Amino acid sequence: MLWILASLFFCWCAYREIRGSLVARPGFDSPAPVSTPYLALVLVLAVAFAWPTVHRWYFQRFLSIRATLLADNHRAIVHCNTLFDTMLDPEMLAAGHANPLTGKIGIQSPWCNVLSSYLSHPNRADDRELQSLDIFTHESMHVRGEMNESITECEAVQRNYRAAKLLGVADETAKKNALDYYNNGYQLRRKIGGIQSAYYSEQCSPGKALDEHLSDSTWAAP
């Protein structure tokens, strides 16, 4: 909101400059000519301050549409929390959270930025960027209705390939990214233990109890 307020202030400065060239200001007999450098500066600043918020709004809408598809058309509304939002969030220690009743998904700072970074170079994705993809898929599964964390995570693991493709990642790269997360990030949860073990199940494997046998599953043969 502060970014938008700053942008509106510079828009007002631009408006005042243009209006001053059309209508004489109090105490002057004629309008003043427009100061082109000043007008250009305030317009650039208006756009620069508006961009972070506008980009976040666009990205949230983009993610909401894809999350809805992942959640079998249960309506999802993704909100990318700013640092301030995250600090005030009762679930600030979680990377994300979702309410299946409202469809609202909150992704904590900085994970939306990490996901955006992943989408800019998926063929060079690091472990953290692959985790951001899984967070998005995981919360979409909550909107779908599953609340058990280990089952939800297994549903996400099987759909990360689908999620990556919905987000615009090329097929071959999406498959590799999804498998990399399953073989590395997901298996690491078992090794770390503690709270991470709540997101892991030995039955989350091809042919085991949690295998949904999806035609486009992460681990399905091409």
Name these PLM-found stretches.
Residues 2, 7-21, 34-38, 55, ...:
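Metalloprotease/metallohydrolase-associated module, dominated by Zn2+-dependent proteases
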Residues 20-30:
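Membrane-helix interface linkers and caps
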Residues 29-57:
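Internal/C-terminal transmembrane anchor helices
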Residues 68-101:
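Short extracytoplasmic
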Residues 87, 119, 211:
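Cys/His-rich zinc-coordinating "finger/knuckle" motifs
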Residues 90-133, 140-143:
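Active-site scaffold of zinc-dependent metalloenzymes
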Residues 130-158:
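Active-site recognition of the HExxH zinc-binding catalytic motif
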